Structures are given as C-alpha cells and as structure tokens.
Amino acid sequence: MDSSTLSPAVTATDAPIQSYERIRNAADISVIVIYFVVVMAVGLWAMFSTNRGTVGGFFLAGRSMVWWPIGASLFASNIGSGHFVGLAGTGAAAGIAMGGFEWNALVFVVVLGWLFVPIYIKAGVVTMPEYLRKRFGGKRIQIYLSVLSLLLYIFTKISADIFSGAIFINLALGLDIYLAIFILLAITALYTITGGLAAVIYTDTLQTAIMLVGSFILTGFAFREVGGYEAFMDKYMKAIPTLVSDGNITVKEECYTPRADSFHIFRDPITGDMPWPGLIFGLSILALWYWCTDQVIVQRCLSAKNMSHVKAGCTLCGYLKLLPMFLMVMPGMISRILYTDKIACVLPSECKKYCGTPVGCTNIAYPTLVVELMPNGLRGLMLSVMMASLMSSLTSIFNSASTLFTMDIYTKIRKGASEKELMIAGRLFILVLIGISIAWVPIVQSAQSGQLFDYIQSITSYLGPPIAAVFLLAIFCKRVNEPGAFWGLILGFLIGISRMITEFAYGTGSCMEPSNCPKIICGVHYLYFAIILFAISVVTVLVISLLTKPIPDVHLYRLCWSLRNSTEERIDLDAGEEEPVEEDPKDTIEIDAEAPQKEKGCFRKAYDLFCGLDQDKGPKMTKEEEEAMKLKMTDTSEKPLWRTVVNINGIILLAVAVFCHAYFA
C-alpha cells in the first residue's frame, strides 16, 4: 500500500492521545461559547414570543409554523449525531450502500405530506396513538403504542445519540464521557422543558443551517486532501491496513479489504451486506413507520399553518435528505483512505489502542476527520455542529415523548387533571427520561461500537413493521377494526421481540468471530425479517377484522382515506368513554371583578414565566371562538395556486429520488 495516503498522525502509535489536545485553543473555544449563547438566545426568544400555556401551544406550536422551519426541523430531528458517527462509520467499513437509507426517505416524505398528514389533521389529533383511539375505539391500542414508542425512543434514538455525541466530545475535548453527557443533557433539557415545540422548531432551524455549513466545509477539505472524486474512488479500493497478522492471529482477507461492490447501492440479494430487495421493500416498511407514523416527525407537520406549508416543508426535507450521502457517507470513506491503520484496523489489540473497542474503529471515522483536518476555529464550529445535531434530536425526542406520556398515559391515570397539571407532568417526565437515558449509556458503551448504526436499524426492523402495518391499514382499509389491529400489533411484537432477545443473547458477532446464533433465527437479514414481519402483521389484522364486526361509517368520517371528504358529523368511538369531569367546587375560584388581585412574589412570577404557566392573564375563549379554533385545527384546504406549486415540487422530488438510485445502483 502506498504510504502517501497515510497521514503522519497515524504512524505514531499514540494517535488518540494527540487528538485530545486539539480543542484547547482560544479560537475553537470561543466559537463553541458563541454558538451556545446564540442557541440559548433563540430558545429564550421562542419562549417569550409564543403561547406555551396551553397543551396545543406547548406541544403543537399553536398550528402557526410556516414551511421552511418545518422542513429544516424535520431534517434536524432525523439527522442526529448517530448519523454523523453511524453513516460515516458504515461508509468507511462498507461503501455507499447506507446512503440508500437516506434516499429512501425522499419517497416517504411525499407519502407523509400528501397522504398521511391530511388524515391526521382532519381527525384533529395531537399524538399518533390518539389517532388510533379515534379510529378503532378502546384504550388498549393507544396505551400499548404509547409505551412501545417510549421504549423505542430510549433503546434506539436517545441512547445511540448520546453515545455518538460522547464519542465526539471524548475525542475532541478529552472530557470524561459522563461529565460531557451531563453538561449536554442539562442544556438540552433546559430549553425543551421551558420552550415547548416552537422553541424546538426554531432552534432546529438554526442548527440545520450550522450543520450544513460545517459539513460542506469539511467535505470540501476532505476531497481536497484526497485529490478529487476520481482519486477518491481509486484510493478507497486500496485502503488496506498495514497490520493484518499478530503472532498467532491471521485475519481473513475479506475482513480488511474494501468490498468489491463498495460503490453500488444495490447489492447481491443473498451474499450482499445490504441485499437490494431488502433495501427497496424492507427499508420502505421501516421508512413508512419512521416518516409517516412516528410522533417526532408527524408532530412537526401538525404544527403547520395550512396544508400547503406541510407539503412544502416535506419537500424541503426531501431535498435536504439528498445531502447525507455526500456530507457523511463519503467523508467517512475518505477518512478510511487518510487514516487507514486507525479507521480500518482489524487486529483487536490495534483497535483497542486507537478507539478503546476491540471490534473495530470505523465509528471514529467522522470525528477523526474533524479533529485532524479542520483548522482552528472551524474545528470548534464542527464540534458545535455535532452538539447541535445531538441536541436537536434529543430535544425533539424529549418534547415528543413528553407529549405521548402526558396526552396518552397520564390522562388515563389522572382523569380530571387540569391543563396546568398536565403541563407540569409533561415537564417532569422529561427529567425521568433523562435519568433513564443516562443509566442506559454504559450498556450502549459496552455494546460493540462496530454495530451502532446496525443496532439502531435492526431494533427498528424488529419492532417497527407491525406499527407500520396497522397505520397503513387503518387509513386505507376501512374494514379493519379494533380486535384485528390489536392482535396484529401483539403478534407482531411477540415475533419481533423474540428475534431481538435471541440476537442480543448470542451477540451479532464480527468478521473475526462470527456469532453462533441459530441460522434459522439470525440467518435472515434484518431487512428481510422486516418484510416477513410486516406480511404476518397485515394478514393477522385483515383475517381477524374480517371475522369480527365492522365499524359503522358514522364513526369513521374523515378518519380513513375513502371517507376523507365527508362532511357529516362523526360520532367518535371514544366519545362515550370520556365521562365529563365533575369539577370540585373547592377547585373553582369565584373571581370578583372588583376585588384587587393578589400580587405574586418575584420568585413565583419568575417560575410561572419560566414554565409558561403565567398565561392566565388573557381572556378565556368563548364557545364560538373555541369552535372556530377547532375548525382551524382541522382545516386542510389549500389555495389552488400554491397547491399546484407544491404538487409540481413533489413530482420533481420523486423524479430526483429515482435518478439518484439509478445512477448509483
């Protein structure tokens, strides 16, 4: 292997030690400080300028958002630091196939904006389980889904993001991982708890801009260093580590040579690491679950001013999703070229020396590039970008998780909870989540790092498909009823969780030491498993629904696609269940207009302002105003001109998606 592709930093055996000293200069530190000050300022501005005193205001930003913050926020909530670490790492290990995961989303943001969101808005819901309750009646599906979603957040999103953020801080600052995580979560929680959804969406928009600028600059540096695109394709295939045997260990050749199909998205259906049928069909099922039924994503769309803004926001997000292939996957591959011995290490002893885990160091591909290539000041900017993507993902998840908990679980435990109590419960729940997340970090830390991105995708493949099946059928097949949906979800969950537990018990193995899990269980690629699980769930739901009583149309107006334009009044299936709460006379306060209002103390005023609980000063809404508000919340009309504009853009986006897949296939 020609030594010219190796940077001098790698030849020293104590490479990681040098990296720690990198961000100890004035330029970098001042950039990071300025960045955090700006973020806090934006959060505070959103906190004082929007209504957070109502559940609709805190959780849905009062349905007043325009298209560009929605698009940016969809993108930022999706791209966490797990993407920077995971996508770049998989790129370094196996080429561009993981980029296909990002491009698949181009199709599904269109499906979300054009097919799913209109139904959710007409149903007038805040959370996804709430939609299923209106559609099927009964509470068991709603509670089951809320709990499952919270589990998925903790196991995949929160833990993976925190872990990859910690890798970064550790490489750049040399801080103890737990200290770093504590500081991060404190800042994140502060403006989620105080600001509500508007703060989250505005800070997301700011962070998307910073993320894109920073990663464009880094990609430029990386391609310049490697000598352009042609040289990049050529050198990647030759990026083989120098140390491949160690006394009695000799590593198999396929464990350290780049894959022959590194530059193809579609790979062999049987021997490929990303089989093409799995990438087209299996991944589409996961994308349907993630983009069209996941609380974090849908909540962004529900906060839009009107339907045209939803569609435009989705289209913007689709165009942004073209970028990760070029801004994350390819820089990860370049990192392997520049620091081959470090990133592509195969000997457990070498890997342990470079990144502390024996299974491989591809996870540090992106952080290494930042720390080694960027000049002072810009390096601080890139660290801010990583923190930005981590924090924006976490704030989105914290806000959505507290929405799920407050609206779907807490209201069942405390039937007569006041608006104020709900607001406080939602904020306290965020603190509980943070506690669980920190406790989960050591488990993720010890999960072999080489599997981080695969870990996220595979857990999604085991738990997501039944949810996707139920939502798809709920919207497009009005014959489906509650028993069918419930048992479909339960059976799907049992099959998925048994595969997940088996795989964790045996471990997924690595190239050096394959797992000894029974072939019949773990031998099926997780994307194929998603297809099988989805099919089983769909069949179960349909069969049980056809054997039981259908739901009368009067309960389904505007809840499924075939009845989406009906104007008749809908009798909600859950209408009878929500018995009106008798207000305790001692809870109601007679307000004498003449009596002077008691002045609150300074501390109490500050507390109320901080938590958005001070908004009792405005007049109460009249019945007519409430009806008008309800109409606004469920309105999906569009102006003809803008409808045409967004539709044309949607078609262009789909054409771009097809072209990208074909070009790199």
UniProtKB/Swiss-Prot annotation:
Extracellular side: 1-24, 91-95, 170-176, 222-275, 332-375, 445-451, 505-525, 664-665
NCBIfam families in the cross-refs: sss
Catalytic activity: D-glucose(out) + 2 Na(+)(out) = D-glucose(in) + 2 Na(+)(in); D-galactose(out) + 2 Na(+)(out) = D-galactose(in) + 2 Na(+)(in)
Pfam families (UniProt xref): SSF
Topology of this chain in the membrane: Multi-pass membrane protein
Molecular-function annotations in GO: alpha-glucoside transmembrane transporter activity; D-glucose transmembrane transporter activity; D-glucose:sodium symporter activity; galactose:sodium symporter activity; water transmembrane transporter activity
Species of provenance: Rattus norvegicus
Stretches assigned to the Cytoplasmic side: 48-66, 118-139, 194-202, 296-309, 407-422, 478-481, 548-645
UniProt name for this protein: Sodium/glucose cotransporter 1
Gene name for this UniProt entry: Slc5a1
TM segment ranges: 25-47, 67-90, 96-117, 140-169, 177-193, 203-221, 276-295, 310-331, 376-406, 423-444, 452-477, 482-504, 526-547, 646-663
First-listed, main subcellular location of the protein, grouped into a coarse class: membrane
Glycosylated residue positions: 248
PTM info: N-glycosylation is not necessary for the cotransporter function.
GO BP terms in the entry: alpha-glucoside transport; carbohydrate utilization; D-glucose import across plasma membrane; D-glucose transmembrane transport; intestinal absorption; intestinal D-glucose absorption; metanephros development; renal D-glucose absorption
Residues binding D-glucose: 457
Family that this chain belongs to: Belongs to the sodium:solute symporter (SSF) (TC 2.A.21) family.
GO terms under cellular component: apical plasma membrane; basolateral plasma membrane; brush border; brush border membrane; cell-cell junction; early endosome; intracellular organelle; perinuclear region of cytoplasm
Matching PANTHER family: SODIUM_GLUCOSE COTRANSPORTER 1 (PTHR11819:SF151), SOLUTE CARRIER FAMILY 5 (PTHR11819)
Presence of keyword Disulfide bond: yes
Keywords: Cell membrane, Disulfide bond, Glycoprotein, Ion transport, Membrane, Phosphoprotein, Sodium, Sodium transport, Sugar transport, Symport, Transmembrane, Transmembrane helix, Transport
InterPro entries from the UniProt entry: Na/Glc_symporter_sf, Na/solute_symporter, Na/solute_symporter_CS
Free-text comment about domains: The cholesterol-binding site is formed by transmembrane helices TM1, TM7 and TM13.
Cystine pairs: 255-511, 255-611, 345-351, 355-361, 517-522
Role, per record: Electrogenic Na(+)-coupled sugar symporter that actively transports D-glucose or D-galactose at the plasma membrane, with a Na(+) to sugar coupling ratio of 2:1. Transporter activity is driven by a transmembrane Na(+) electrochemical gradient set by the Na(+)/K(+) pump. Has a primary role in the transport of dietary monosaccharides from enterocytes to blood. Responsible for the absorption of D-glucose or D-galactose across the apical brush-border membrane of enterocytes, whereas basolateral exit is provided by GLUT2.
Regulation: Enhanced by the interaction with PDZK1IP1/MAP17; but unlike SLC5A2/SGLT2, PDZK1IP1 is not essential for SLC5A1 transporter activity. Possibly modulated by cholesterol binding.
Feature type site, description Implicated in sodium coupling: 43, 300
Gene3D superfamilies: Sodium/glucose cotransporter (1.20.1730.10)
